[in-house]
């Protein structure tokens, strides 16, 4: 009997809840092995597809899709509880309610996708076998387009929160080969199609599978095979010599990081790690990269002696240093003040005054700010006041900012969860209007200590891997508590430090040049394909069926 078959009233909600929980496990290795993530994701989502398509109405389909997604988000984002309760100081019931409220909101998007697909694709058991086979293919494509469209909408509404996009379960599957062409939303379309095609195999009133109903599943297999072939193609080419980098993971406990009494302890730890001599046979680093908010106070609140110490590290190592730091600046001629979450770069020749005023030549200001943590959405000041979050409102950086030019390579920085928003990384990789060439390496600095040693760390690494596949650019990640890593241009983790451990990661990173179709056009091709499928579905899906 299919998952939507007859049975006790509790049966189907229980199946959807279990499938949603299994779905949450598919977004990063541990506890599941990497090879199993894609199959688990497709099978779990197929349960939701089948249940929603066989719902008696679009409203019931919405409820079924929402229930599935509610369990998926609640478990997959459980680490939000850690940030709100353990480090934000929110009472346990309120922190749990916060996670559930966020999950309930996010689950509306999959729920609406299921409702739209059910409205466009009513059950068709009365159709002839050939028509049923054609309708199975059409239904799978329509359901996938609805799901992918709502995934995209989730990425843009209210600044967007596309964490747990289904594509991230497929960084080790053949579908990853499509990333350089269609990006995260195109992969979501293909993954959702595979799930709906599998659901189509269950859509038989007798419980038997008609061979003609396997048409959609066959197309899904062909798309996976094409993805594998595309994955063999090199979309970029090396430029210059490999860049030698030292990535620092300070592992400062989040509960201590912003404690004024422990400020000196954290600074000393990062100074010591940055000052370590290279191991025997290891070349000196061209740049030392430290995580987000290495300095947990604004740069002008520190005495000049702190900056003197950092300049001395750069002088002794004969290198440049990049670090995350909150900046307080007053632009020339401006009467106001700017507060930004930034990365600054400097070397032994950088004047201390530039460091204290935040006017270094190498600088990146975060542009996609975290709601409640880095800016306060209108009407939510009461919620922020309940949380013990330091620093507060920041100003946004420009959409395109200069890369850091180091030893013939050009590094484009992003901060925290900015690597979740692929289109926003692309301007830095493209040649500028002034002819300045695009970046050859991406670098993410973050502080995931807010979430403890949870799934968030491994999920974030998967996100970074997909960004490198989309752009055919390597990425390095320097984090406070993990996972500090180097990812090559094909999305493979070349080296990584264990989480919750202080250390340094010396890596040689080969810069790459050349634009993938996704790096050139962004989400436009995928959205065009999704839009065409939805237009076709709207034009055809509600036509009266011929008897």
Swiss-Prot record:
Coiled coil: none annotated. It is found in: Cell inner membrane. The active site is at residues 292, 366, 416. The keyword GTP-binding does not apply. It comes from the Bacteria. GO terms for biological process: lipoprotein biosynthetic process. One of its GO terms (molecular function) is N-acyltransferase activity. The chain crosses the membrane at residues 31-51, 65-85, 89-109, 144-164, 181-201, 215-235. The keyword Cell inner membrane applies. Keywords: Acyltransferase, Cell inner membrane, Cell membrane, Membrane, Transferase, Transmembrane, Transmembrane helix. Its EC number is 2.3.1.269. Pathway: Protein modification; lipoprotein biosynthesis (N-acyl transfer). GO terms for cellular component: plasma membrane. It is a multi-pass membrane protein. Belongs to the CN hydrolase family. Apolipoprotein N-acyltransferase subfamily. PANTHER family: APOLIPOPROTEIN N-ACYLTRANSFERASE. NCBIfam families: lnt. Catalyzes the phospholipid dependent N-acylation of the N-terminal cysteine of apolipoprotein, the last step in lipoprotein maturation. This is Putative apolipoprotein N-acyltransferase. The lineage of its organism: Bacteria, Pseudomonadati, Pseudomonadota, Betaproteobacteria, Burkholderiales.
